[in-house]
C-alpha cells in the first residue's frame, strides 16, 4: 500500500512539475526562443534527472498512469537537449551537476527581470515569463479556453473527454490527475501531512492548508466584480456569483427544483429520502443537516454564544441574533408585494401573505379547523386537551397560552406599558391600545359581507353578524329565553332578580314556584311564578 502511494505521489509530482512529458513539447517549442542578450542556446528539454523521472513515470501501473505518458515518444539523446548557460561551451553546460556532487546547490543563471526569480533552465524561465506577459498559446478546441502550458491543456481536455486514467486500487475511484489520486489515497491511510503552524490543524492537501491559513491571516483574495464581496477561496466566489447571474445548475431529479449549490441539493434530497444522518448523542433526536444538530445540542448545553452588542441579550443561533438586531436598527427588509407592509423576519412575511391568499395549511385533526400559522394550531389544540401549562405564581391562575399569562400578571403589577400618543390613556395590552387608537383615527377595518357595515373591533363584527344569521347563543337559565347578545341576556336576567338584587335560579322539579332561594317571593313575575306575593294557604 505504501509502495502504491509513493508511485502515485511520484506521478503527482511529475504531473505538477514543469518536467512533465506534456511540457516536453513546450520546451521543444521554446528551444529557439531563449533571450538573445544572454547568449542562451536552448537545445530542448533538460535531461539527466528529468529523463530518469520520466522513465519512472512510464513504469507506473496503468491504473494510476496517463496513457499519454506511456505512449509519449521521448528522444534518448538527452545530452543534445541541454540548455547552455550564458557564455558556456557545450562541454561546460553541466555546472550544476558538479556542484550537486560536491553538495552545493544548482546554479540559476536565468533571472526574471520583472520579479527577480531565477531558474536553472532557460525553458523553465520562458514558461515563467508567460505569467508576466499573460501569453496563453495553447487553446482548447472544444471551448476555446487558453493555457500557458500544453500540460495544463491536456489536463483540461479531460473535463471534456471524461478521461480518468488514475484509479485507486483500494476503492476503484478514478481521477483525471495523479495529484488528485495521491490526495484521495490519504483518505484510506489517514495521513494528513500538511499542518497549520498557528492552530495545529492538519490537512491531506496543501491547497486545503493554504485556504485554512487565510482564516488566521484574514486574507480574502477572491473579490466579486459586481458587489466587491471578497472570499477566501475561488470556489466560494464562483458560488456567490450565481446570486448575480441567477444560475441554478443543480436540479433535483425527484421534483425538478433547482439550486445554486450542490450542498443545497444534497440537503434538499433528504426531504424525499427522509434521511436524517446526524443524531444527537444525548436524546437520540436525528437531523437532516449537521448545522441543525449543532444548534440542537445547545438545548442540552445551554450555550448561547451570540451576544447583542446593544443590550447584551444572548442567543444560541446567529440567525436569532441577526433578527433581534433589527429591533435596535428598525430594519424591516421583508416587504409584502401586495400591501407593502414590511417585516423583520421572512417567516412573518410568509404568515402575513396568507391573509391575502387565504391559505390555511395547518388543520386540526380533532375538529377540522384550519390555521394559517402552526403556532395558532398548537394553541388551538389546548382547547381539546384542556391543558393549561402556564400558571401565575401569585394567585395560581392557569392559562393555556403564555401570552395570556403575561397579560394576566399585569393585574398584579398594575403595569400599563402601552400609552396612547393622542390622549395619554395607558393600557396593559398592546391589542387594547390598538383598538383604542381607532377611536381617534376612525378606522373600521372589519366589514360585514352581508350589509357592508364596518366595525373597529372584530368581536363587534361577529356579534353583528348574528343579526343576519338569526343565531341566539345566549340562553337564560331561569326561563329558557334566548338572545343574540350576552349584554341582552344580562339585562333580561335582571327581570328575575329578587328584592336583594340576586338573580332567581332556574326552577327545578323540587322547587316551589314563585319563591327565590331565600324563600322570598319573586317580584318580577317570572313565567310559571306568582308575581303577587306568597301563595295563599
From Swiss-Prot:
GO biological process, any: regulation of transcription by RNA polymerase II
The keyword Nucleus appears for this protein: yes
Ranges where the record places region Disordered: 12-109, 497-537
InterPro entries cross-referenced by the UniProt entry: Znf_C2H2_sf, Znf_C2H2_type
Signal peptide start and end residues: none
Function: May be involved in transcriptional regulation.
Pfam short name (any one): zf-C2H2
Major subcellular location class: nucleus
Amino acid composition bias (Basic and acidic residues), ranges on this chain: 89-104
GO MF assignments: DNA-binding transcription factor activity; RNA polymerase II cis-regulatory region sequence-specific DNA binding; zinc ion binding
TM regions (residue ranges): none
Coiled coil: none
Subcellular location: Nucleus
Intrachain S-S bonds: none
Zinc finger extent (C2H2-type): 110-132, 138-160, 166-188, 194-216, 222-244, 250-272, 278-300, 306-328, 334-356, 362-384, 390-412, 418-440, 446-468, 474-496
Protein name: Zinc finger protein 835
Amino acid at each position: 500500500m505504501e509502495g502504491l502511494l509513493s508511485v502515485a505521489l511520484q506521478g503527482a509530482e511529475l504531473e505538477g512539475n514543469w518536467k512533465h512529458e506534456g511540457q516536453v513539447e513546450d520546451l521543444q517549442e521554446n528551444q529557439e526562443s531563449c533571450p538573445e542578450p544572454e547568449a542562451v542556446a536552448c537545445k530542448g528539454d533538460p535531461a539527466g534527472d528529468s529523463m530518469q523521472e520520466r522513465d519512472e513515470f512510464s513504469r507506473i501501473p496503468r491504473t494510476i498512469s496517463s496513457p499519454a505518458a506511456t505512449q509519449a515518444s521521448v528522444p534518448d539523446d538527452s545530452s543534445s537537449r541541454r540548455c547552455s548557460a550564458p557564455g558556456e561551451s557545450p562541454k561546460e553546460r553541466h555546472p550544476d551537476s558538479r556542484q550537486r556532487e560536491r553538495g552545493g546547490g544548482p546554479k540559476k543563471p536565468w533571472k526574471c527581470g520583472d520579479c527577480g526569480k531565477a531558474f536553472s533552465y532557460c525553458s523553465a524561465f520562458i514558461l515563467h515569463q508567460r505569467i508576466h506577459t499573460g501569453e496563453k498559446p495553447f487553446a482548447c478546441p472544444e471551448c476555446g479556453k487558453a493555457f500557458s502550458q500544453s500540460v495544463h491543456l491536456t489536463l483540461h481536455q479531460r473535463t471534456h473527454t471524461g478521461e480518468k486514467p488514475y484509479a485507486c486500487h483500494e476503492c476503484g475511484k478514478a481521477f483525471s490527475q495523479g495529484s488528485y489520486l495521491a490526495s484521495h489515497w490519504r483518505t484510506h491511510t489517514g495521513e494528513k501531512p500538511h499542518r497549520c503552524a498557528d492552530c495545529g490543524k492538519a490537512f491531506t492537501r496543501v491547497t486545503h492548508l493554504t485556504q485554512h491559513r487565510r482564516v488566521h491571516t484574514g486574507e480574502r483574495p477572491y473579490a466579486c466584480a459586481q458587489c466587491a464581496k471578497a472570499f477566501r477561496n475561488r470556489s466560494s466566489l464562483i458560488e456567490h456569483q450565481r446570486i448575480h447571474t441567477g444560475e441554478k445548475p443543480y436540479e433535483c431529479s425527484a421534483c425538478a427544483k433547482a439550486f445554486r449549490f450542490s450542498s443545497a441539493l444534497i440537503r434538499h434530497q433528504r426531504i424525499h429520502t427522509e434521511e436524517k444522518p446526524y443524531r444527537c448523542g444525548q436524546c437520540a433526536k436525528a437531523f437532516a443537516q449537521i448545522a441543525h444538530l449543532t444548534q440542537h445540542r445547545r438545548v442540552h448545553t445551554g450555550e448561547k454564544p451570540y451576544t447583542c452588542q446593544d443590550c447584551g441579550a444572548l442567543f444560541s443561533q446567529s440567525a436569532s441574533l441577526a433578527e433581534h438586531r433589527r429591533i435596535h436598527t428598525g430594519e424591516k427588509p421583508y416587504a409584502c408585494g401586495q400591501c407593502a407592509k414590511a417585516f423583520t423576519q421572512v417567516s412573518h412575511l410568509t404568515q402575513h401573505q396568507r391573509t391575502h391568499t387565504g391559505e390555511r395549511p395547518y388543520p386540526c385533526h380533532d375538529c377540522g379547523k384550519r390555521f394559517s400559522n402552526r403556532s395558532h394550531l398548537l394553541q388551538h389544540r389546548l382547547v381539546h386537551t384542556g391543558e393549561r401549562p402556564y400558571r401565575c405564581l401569585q394567585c395560581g391562575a392557569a392559562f393555556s397560552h403564555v401570552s395570556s399569562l403575561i397579560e394576566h400578571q399585569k393585574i398584579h403589577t398594575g403595569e400599563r406599558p402601552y400609552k396612547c400618543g393622542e390622549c395619554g390613556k395607558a393600557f396593559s395590552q398592546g391589542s387594547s391600545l390598538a383598538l383604542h387608537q381607532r377611536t381617534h383615527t376612525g378606522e373600521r377595518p372589519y366589514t360585514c359581507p352581508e350589509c357592508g357595515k364596518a366595525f373597529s373591533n372584530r368581536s363587534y363584527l361577529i356579534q353583528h353578524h348574528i343579526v343576519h344569521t338569526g343565531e341566539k347563543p345566549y340562553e337564560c337559565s331561569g326561563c329558557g329565553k334566548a338572545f343574540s347578545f350576552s349584554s341582552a341576556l344580562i339585562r333580561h336576567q335582571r327581570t328575575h332578580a329578587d328584592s336583594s338584587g340576586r338573580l332567581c335560579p332556574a326552577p327545578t322539579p323540587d322547587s316551589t314556584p314563585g319563591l327565590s332561594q331565600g324563600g322570598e317571593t319573586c317580584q318580577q313575575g317570572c313565567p310559571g311564578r306568582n308575581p303577587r306575593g306568597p301563595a295563599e294557604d
